[in-house]
């Protein structure tokens, strides 16, 4: 089976109450170093490196994208065609799938499978292109190793604009946007966590100023809004785990996931239709549970 239900449980402690338990499913078959997920047709797309060894900056061209939906067989949506090496954050607009990769964003037309993708190159040295989020016709792309967020014109998704530097933040990784505000998960590209590696908020995209939203340092990777829009989920590599942030109070609540093999590197997560998908990059599986 593509997805196997394990004996794992999820425990989310309610404020002042007992921890609740829910079953957790692990999805592993057909995946190899899965860094990112994105909602798609009632399930998710899962981006895989496909390499023998884990290297987020590899250039082997073995990357591929799989569609997973509970109860259905897996489907390879984008095979290893040589254009993807370490695919990370994704974004979908008008049937075109934007995929972050090393020093570029690759754009596939899902309405025309097999056609050559558009490759949007980033400036030299902008290697760790990590995540994408859009506000209208502007697509934002984080580059973790240089501390920059770029903006791209996607008013015509078939002809994507040239990346333009927009804002600098220490280690920008995961991005989400809602109601005109951006939230950024910060990750140290060199593995050395500092006080600058926190969760940031940019309240006004037209006049961008990054302010710490949660000042607890970490190695933050994925970030997603909860289904009710009242919280943020964030993944952290050190310590490896998942937390939930109340947007009104900024209180941080750990989400305890008990697995036979613990999370090692939870990455670019998705929340869709009441289900949470957390890719665990080093373990090559996705942890799935209901909110």
Regions found by a protein language model. Name each.
Residues 265-291:
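Blade-level signature of beta-propeller repeat domains, shared across WD40, Kelch, NHL, RCC1
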Residues 104-106, 110-135, 142:
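Asp-box/WD-like beta-propeller blade repeats and closely related beta-sheet repeat scaffolds
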Residues 68-72, 109-115, 153-158, 203-207, ...:
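Short loop/turn segments that connect beta-strands within beta-propeller blades
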Residues 22-28, 73-80, 114-122, 159-167, ...:
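A short beta-strand motif characteristic of beta-propeller blades
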Residues 12-14:
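C-terminal motif of bacterial Sec signal peptides marking the signal peptidase cleavage site
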Residues 56-57, 61-66, 104-106, 148-151, ...:
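A short loop-to-beta-strand structural motif that recurs across blades of beta-propeller domains
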Residues 30-42, 81-96, 123-140, 168-181, ...:
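Beta-rich, blade/repeat-based domains predominating
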Residues 30, 45-59, 97-103, 139-146, ...:
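Conserved beta-strand positions in repeat-built beta-propeller and related beta-rich domains
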